[in-house]
């Protein structure tokens, strides 16, 4: 099914309001497995709207008109649609009663003939009741094309769509199901390159890659009549993706850290810490508490996070974490030594199961001979301490700091998963 959205209102064309309805409707229709092919905006002009309707009727199976259902002279959507279809406007009984009730309880409001328009629908249409306003919507199919009229205000349109329109549309259509895979440790360009054959040959399910700061997302989507059917199809595609190797021989399966739109590396670590009954602390230099703040974002953080340290200067690193100042001066703050000593010191002082440390060069200037984006991340548990070096090049200062925390969370995640495998 090809769908088209028509926003009616001169105020949209002049930029006075933003057409947020288009985004909302497109998302809702996609969830139903209905493909939106066109977004159109037209002013409050009958001739131009008739022209748009003529074009839409020839290229779309579902035409949804938003706006122009109110009581003013320029609210002409229903009148124009009726004229286009060669039908009359009739009164909907329930909408008329709602109009009567509205004015009966507001004696100071003047009821003009224009107000009656809000209770009218196109002859033969099924009314879509307005749960938060007065203007009734409607849905009608003529010569194989389904036309829908909806109010313009989002506060009226959204409830009408969710509670009136969607049930009317879902009777005969499959639903779009999606699964979101989240990757860390592979860039979008490489990921797209190594699964190019899957993307090029996709029909159903489909693959859509998205890049976020420091990570990549793949949305797998399929049309199905049930969740079970969708899962079977998506499982096959996911396994094909997981079995693919990166350019340096890593398995993509090892780079998938989780699922879902709102998931994050921070949450995965928080979840695993709670699952295994472990605690964590952190000592942060260049990230200045970002790692700890991310952990504390989740309700119940006190179960896994006792407290931590922000040690920006060399002197504070020495004083707060019991690291000999002479050793810090010898190795420099941007080093494996400092990252490991910070992680160990924080872990011991808080008696936590894991200590994480971040030290490096946020930029834009170099430090101790290290270019901007050079970061050392230390991790200590009750048995050992180690560190990694990453170079986050070509990024802003804020991006370097944020991506550094992602590397730190991934390091903890891997350690927790290894502990799980050893149980």
From Swiss-Prot:
InterPro entries: CinA, CinA-like_C, CinA_C, CinA_KH, Competence-induced_CinA, MoaB/Mog-like_dom_sf, MoaB/Mog_dom. Belongs to the CinA family. PANTHER family: NICOTINAMIDE-NUCLEOTIDE AMIDOHYDROLASE PNCC, NMN AMIDOHYDROLASE-LIKE PROTEIN YFAY. NCBIfam families: cinA_nterm, molyb_syn, PncC_domain, PRK00549.1. This is Putative competence-damage inducible protein. It comes from Streptococcus thermophilus (strain CNRZ 1066). The lineage of its organism: Bacteria, Bacillati, Bacillota, Bacilli, Lactobacillales. The gene is cinA.
């Amino acid at each position: 099914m090809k769908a088209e959205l028509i926003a009616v209102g001169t105020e949209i064309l002049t930029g006075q309001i933003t057409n947020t309805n288009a985004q909302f409707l497109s998302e809702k229709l996609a969830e139903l497995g209905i493909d939106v092919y066109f977004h159109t905006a037209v002013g409050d002009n009958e001739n131009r709207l008739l022209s748009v309707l003529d074009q839409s009727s020839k290229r779309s199976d579902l035409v949804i008109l938003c706006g122009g259902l109110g009581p003013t002279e320029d609210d002409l959507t229903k009148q124009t649609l009726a004229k286009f279809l060669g039908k009359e406007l009739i009164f909907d009984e329930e909408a008329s009663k709602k109009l009567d009730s509205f004015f009966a309880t507001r004696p100071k409001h003047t009821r003009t003939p224009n107000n009656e328009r809000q209770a009218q629908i196109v002859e033969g249409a099924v009314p879509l009741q307005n749960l938060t306003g007065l203007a009734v919507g409607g849905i009608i199919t003529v010569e194989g094309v389904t036309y829908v009229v909806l109010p313009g205000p989002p506060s009226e349109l959204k409830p009408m769509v969710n509670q009136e329109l969607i049930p009317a549309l879902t009777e005969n259509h499959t639903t779009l199901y999606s699964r979101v895979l989240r990757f860390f440790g592979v860039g979008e360009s490489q990921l797209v390159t190594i699964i190019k054959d899957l993307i090029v040959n996709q029909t159903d399910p489909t693959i859509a890659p998205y890049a976020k700061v420091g990570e990549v997302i793949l949305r797998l989507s399929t049309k199905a009549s049930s969740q079970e059917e969708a899962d079977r199809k998506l499982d096959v595609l996911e396994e094909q993706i997981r079995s693919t190797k990166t350019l340096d021989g890593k398995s993509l399966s090892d780079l998938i850290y989780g699922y879902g739109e709102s998931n994050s590396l921070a949450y995965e670590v928080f979840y695993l810490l709670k699952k295994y009954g472990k605690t964590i602390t952190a000592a942060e230099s260049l990230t200045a508490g970002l790692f700890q703040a991310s952990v504390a974002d989740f309700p119940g953080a006190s179960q896994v996070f006792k407290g931590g340290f922000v040690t920006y200067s060399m002197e504070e690193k020495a004083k707060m974490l019991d690291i000999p100042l002479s050793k810090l001066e010898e190795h420099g703050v941007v080093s494996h030594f400092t990252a490991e000593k910070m992680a160990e010191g924080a872990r011991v002082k808080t008696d936590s199961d894991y200590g994480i440390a971040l030290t490096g060069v946020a930029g834009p200037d170099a430090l101790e001979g290290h270019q901007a984006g050079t970061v050392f991340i230390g991790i200590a548990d009750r048995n050992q301490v180690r560190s990694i070096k990453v170079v986050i090049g070509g990024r802003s200062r804020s991006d370097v700091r944020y991506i550094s925390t992602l590397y730190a969370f991934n390091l903890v995640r891997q350690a927790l998963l290894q502990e799980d495998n050893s149980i």
